[in-house]
UniProtKB/Swiss-Prot annotation:
Organism expressing this protein natively: Stutzerimonas stutzeri
Primary localization class, coarse: membrane
Record NCBIfam families: PhnE
Regions crossing the membrane: 30-50, 88-108, 136-156, 221-241, 249-269
Protein's name according to its UniProt entry: Phosphite transport system permease protein PtxC
PROSITE patterns to which the protein is assigned, alphabetical: ABC_TM1
């Protein structure tokens, strides 16, 4: 109530100035929303998303494919066990590679721990470069380099993940509380001791959360890796698609969905453990 009376007690010109500021702010926000909406609408029109005729004409084909995929054929489930294990192993190994390399790169890619601005700039460029190349393209390159199998998938997932995981790790380091860091430096700690005892304990929960999230993502991405010859359940999926065994395709997709659900549930348990 007191704040209401204080506002009313202001001079008329000052009250009018405040209200005019509120009005200008509202119109500015409305204009920004309108610009964003216009850009989104233009993008949807450009890619044909607003072409209702094309979308409606495609519905019968989608219905036909869905009909041919029913009921799912699980008769070949025994041959999917090894590819599923390969997919899970690829996601775990790729995430492990990403975490190890990101721990090294992140400390030199964070402004408050980088030893020199030049080192910081090089590290950031490296992370941006790794992040800009899709893991699918990396998978194709590594398949050509080392052959078919799970290894090219692991290398592709690991290197691409370094770009994203390293970025998140570096941002977590940049937002640490500086008080413990300054206290450690004042006590005569070496730079390595500062990192181990003042910085790392603060960012460990964030690091764990990012690593778990990336593992979830890598499991999904590892199914796509198989489509370019990098092994895993995606390879089996592409084989069924090539020979138009849509019932088997539906079964494999359901198996992938079940595995993704299990991975998500397990990652949720891990997150609670690290909090």
């Amino acid at each position: 109530m007191s704040s209401h009376y204080d506002v009313q007690a202001l001079p008329a010109e000052q009250r009018e100035h405040i209200l005019r500021g509120f009005g200008l702010g509202w119109w500015r926000q409305l204009g920004q929303v309108a610009i964003v909406f216009g850009v989104v609408l233009l993008a949807c029109w450009y890619v044909g998303l607003l072409d209702a005729t094309t979308l409606l004409n495609g519905l019968p084909s989608i219905a036909t494919l869905a009909g041919e995929a029913m009921p799912p054929d699980f008769s070949g489930y025994r041959s999917w066990i090894r590819p599923l294990i390969d997919t899970l192993a690829m996601s775990i190994a790729g995430t492990a590679i990403a975490v190890v390399f990101s721990l090294v790169v992140a400390f030199v890619a964070a402004r408050n721990t980088a030893p020199h601005p030049l080192v910081f700039g090089v590290a950031r460029v490296l992370l941006n470069a790794l992040r800009s190349v899709p893991e699918l393209i990396m998978g194709i390159i590594f398949v050509a380099a080392v052959g078919f199998g799970a290894l090219p998938g692991v290398l592709a997932l690991g290197l691409h993940s370094v770009g994203m995981v390293g970025k998140f790790f570096a941002e977590a380091i940049e937002h640490v509380d500086e008080a413990p860091v300054e206290a450690a430096r004042a006590a005569g700690a070496t730079p390595m001791q500062v990192l181990l005892h003042a910085v790392l304990p603060q960012v460990t929960p964030q690091f764990a959360d990012v690593a778990i999230y990336r593992w979830e993502y890598n499991f999904r991405a590892s199914t796509v890796m198989g489509m370019v010859g990098a092994g895993g359940i995606g390879f089996e999926l592409m084989g069924s698609l090539r020979i138009m065994q849509y019932q088997e395709v539906a079964a494999i997709l359901l198996v992938i969905l079940a595995m993704v659900t299990l991975v998500d549930a397990f990652s949720g348990v891990l997150r609670k453990h690290f909090k």
